[in-house]
Amino acid sequence: MHKIVQQGSKSLIESRIKRKSLLSKVVTDVSQLIPYFQNGHYVSMGGFAGTGYPKVVPIALADHVEKNGLQGKLKMNLFVGASVGPETEDRWAMLDMIDKRYPHQNGHHIRNGINSGRIRFADQHLSTFASDLLAGYYTLDKPHGSKRTMDIAIVEATEITEDGCIVPGASVGITPEILQMADKIIIEINTSLPSFKGLHDMVKIALPPFSKPYQITRVDDRIGLEAFPVDPEKIIAIVESQLPDNTSVGAPEDETSSAIANNIVQFFIHEIEQGRFPKNLLPLQSGIGSIANAVIGGLSKGPFDNLSVWTEVIQDTFLDFFDNGKLKFASATSLRFSPPGFNRLFNNWENYKSKIILRNQAISNAAELISRVGCIALNTPCEVDIYGHVNSTNTMGSKMLNGLGGSGEFLRNSRISIVHTPSTRPTKTDPHGISCIVPFASHIDHTEHDIDIIVTEQGLADIRGLAPYERAKVIIQNCAHPIYKPILMEYLETSRQICLKNHMGHEPHQLDKAFKFYTNLSEKGTMKIDKW
């Protein structure tokens, strides 16, 4: 079992609860809260990308299930802005405590549960998830209570203000929305962290027909609240936590990610020279992972100054970007730093906090704002096909990885949409067994109409303004691995010849052969086919 730190200095948690009438809500024995959770309940948690999530109560629930042999008998429908730490939702999945899960996850056991059919999961654009949740789209079949509420919301906070508002920690996600729609609320105050007051800018989302434009034109604009109001009558408990976010040190930059980053930097330089980008570029959006980290690291070393960021998640390499003076300001919904990264943040807190805003994910990922500020989107997919369709979620067309996340809203609405991936990935028997450039993507999350630039370590394909056949040639020549380049080119040219004869040559395919890479991979452990 995970060791729970239930109680620190009484004066410490009291100092974080500025509204003294709420001190009566403090609970030191979390076992008292277990009966509030019933099989089939709709439970929501704060947190985003593995930070700022509640830990003490979810861990206590898992301990209770494990100790009493309740696996499969106490199952929740779980709603989180994105992913949370493995000691919470992934352990819940291991103990068969999750029935439904929306809209994004990251963990071995929860992924296995989804792909084995044990957990009902659907990914969703993160920008619209909160409003859809408020509208009741995800509680339509709720068998008890109101069809538009959560039974319980559990959120992490770093302070409760004098007027009873919640100051979150390292992420916002859907915390404002679940505080509005929950019947009961449990607040975990993490006293191992400093108060994050002043870092957030949170708004109450209005649903149509009452929605209005978000008055943001610059990444550092503020339109909301530093702390979010909560109905004190809904609060059933306040629990002290001293557990850190369970993050890890990212994979180090390697030769492949470095080459991808360099290709992108050179493209940016070219766009500046051609007058399509200003010298300080446009606001950057970067996904999560080693390649994304390498790209941001490469930009921080590049000839760019006075940059800004409009993204979902800020990672370790952004700290280097701040420290060398090239990054002016960053807006996100989550800070996902490694433990050393968080130490850097806290040791220079006053400097960093004046350069960062954390917003609702409904704001950080809003199509309206991504388009208005003119983002440069940078995301890592599973695969890209020769016409520019992108698969970000389902390998072999069927196996869910993590979910769509925010890639859809950024790739669809940014000024420039860039996807970057290694040209190949290894299998157990072949170091180049999987080509990330394929004839026809086995699952499509982002269409050919959304993508401008494709980058691998082999090169960069600028497909803006190109017809499908032109796109395919550029993608194969510039991005495919040399092993797969002739195989893909043969498929393209043969498909074109056949389709032109039949007057269907706009975007040529041979449907009897389009997925042969995948069948060969299943049968032989490699996409290196012998012949078409």
From Swiss-Prot:
It catalyses: acetyl-CoA + H2O = acetate + CoA + H(+). The keyword Hydrolase applies. The active site is at E312. Signal peptide: none annotated. Its EC number is 3.1.2.1. GO terms for cellular component: mitochondrion. GO terms for molecular function: acetate CoA-transferase activity; acetyl-CoA hydrolase activity. Its main location: cytoplasm. The keyword Isomerase does not apply. Pfam families: AcetylCoA_hyd_C, AcetylCoA_hydro. Keywords: Cytoplasm, Hydrolase. One of its GO terms (biological process) is acetate metabolic process. It comes from the Eukaryota. It is found in: Cytoplasm. CoA binds at G287, I288, G289, S290, I291, N402, G406. Belongs to the acetyl-CoA hydrolase/transferase family. Presumably involved in regulating the intracellular acetyl-CoA pool for fatty acid and cholesterol synthesis and fatty acid oxidation. This is Acetyl-CoA hydrolase. The lineage of its organism: Eukaryota, Amoebozoa, Evosea, Eumycetozoa, Dictyostelia.
